[in-house]
């Protein structure tokens, strides 16, 4: 063995022994309690006190009626859920500076405008998440830690009455997920730069849905003349009802769509994927393969002359059934 190799092995072994010694000292000195009580990513030994002091929370608050949405959030999740009654409500929790309200909202001319006030405590940095060590080094399991860490997420939740029609929904999220349950939008312009879109029982009659980095999952969706664009992420739609011409464009990601029976009977299809396969289960149409360009297509005419689903995927599989 070369002298250099022996030297490096000796140094490595010495560091291992030092690490084991420090671990033993920390363990016998009550280190497990520190790990249990501390956010390892911030190394905050004052348990939750500092985290709580740097957050602003608005409890569920009634707001006047409105017909349109104009939302711009750079670092927050957004939830739209069903109200327990005929009134609308808002609640949120956000990181903040100097305990000031980091979010502003107002209603003018029937439009609810919601935006960050410029004093959020959000910061942007490269983060290596070592918080999983809490489960290994203390009695706290992963599920408990996940529930606890969710207390520190930035979020805004709107509660809307069932069957409320939002005439216009203009929504932008920079870094955050968007969850919708039981919502109806007449015109939409929704854009997510980095986050997932998850909707359960959504109606969108016209407009645009744009996703840069994140998956889109729609359950019981009704779409009209909609343009959906996804740059990097998968698209999953279950029980899709079409009432117009819906166009979907994906750069990188797979598409899986399940149609309801009424849509299957009348809809036309124009499907194409450049690097992937097309599966059209139970649908009648013409399927082609251009081996030179590696392009798969599936086409069929609309039975009612107005309902059509067009999907163009640059790199990904398409499944429609």
Regions found by a protein language model. Give the residues of each.
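Generic detector of contiguous secondary-structure segments
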Residues: 95-110, 115, 257-273
């Amino acid at each position: 063995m070369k002298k250099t190799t022996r030297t490096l092995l000796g140094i490595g072994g010495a560091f291992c022994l030092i690490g084991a010694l420090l671990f033993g000292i920390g363990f016998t000195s009550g280190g497990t309690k520190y790990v249990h009580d501390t956010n390892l990513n911030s190394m905050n030994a004052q348990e939750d006190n500092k985290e709580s002091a740097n957050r602003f929370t608005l409890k569920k608050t009634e707001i006047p009626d409105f017909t349109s949405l104009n939302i711009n959030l750079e670092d927050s999740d957004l939830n739209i859920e069903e109200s327990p009654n005929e009134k609308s409500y808002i609640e949120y929790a956000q990181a903040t500076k100097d305990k000031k309200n980091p979010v502003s909202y107002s209603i003018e001319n029937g439009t609810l405008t919601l935006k960050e006030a410029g004093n959020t405590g959000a910061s942007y940095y490269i983060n290596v998440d070592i918080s999983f060590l809490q489960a290994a080094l203390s009695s706290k399991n992963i599920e408990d830690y996940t529930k606890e860490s969710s207390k520190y997420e930035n979020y805004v939740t709107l509660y809307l009455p069932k069957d409320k029609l939002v005439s216009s929904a203009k929504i932008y999220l920079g870094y955050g997920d968007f969850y919708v349950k039981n919502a109806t939008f007449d015109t939409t312009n929704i854009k997510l730069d980095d986050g997932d879109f998850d909707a359960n029982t959504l109606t969108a009659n016209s407009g645009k849905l744009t996703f840069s980095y994140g998956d889109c999952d729609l359950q019981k969706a009704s779409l009209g003349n909609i343009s959906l664009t996804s740059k990097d992420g998968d698209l999953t739609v279950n029980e899709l009802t079409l009432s117009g011409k819906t166009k979907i464009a994906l750069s990188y990601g797979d598409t899986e769509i399940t149609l309801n029976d009424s849509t299957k009977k009348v809809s036309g299809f124009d499907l194409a994927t450049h690097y992937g396969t097309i599966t059209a289960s139970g649908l009648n149409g013409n399927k082609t393969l251009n081996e030179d360009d590696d392009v798969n297509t599936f086409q069929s005419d609309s039975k009612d002359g107005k309902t059509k689903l067009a999907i163009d995927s640059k790199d990904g599989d398409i499944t429609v059934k």
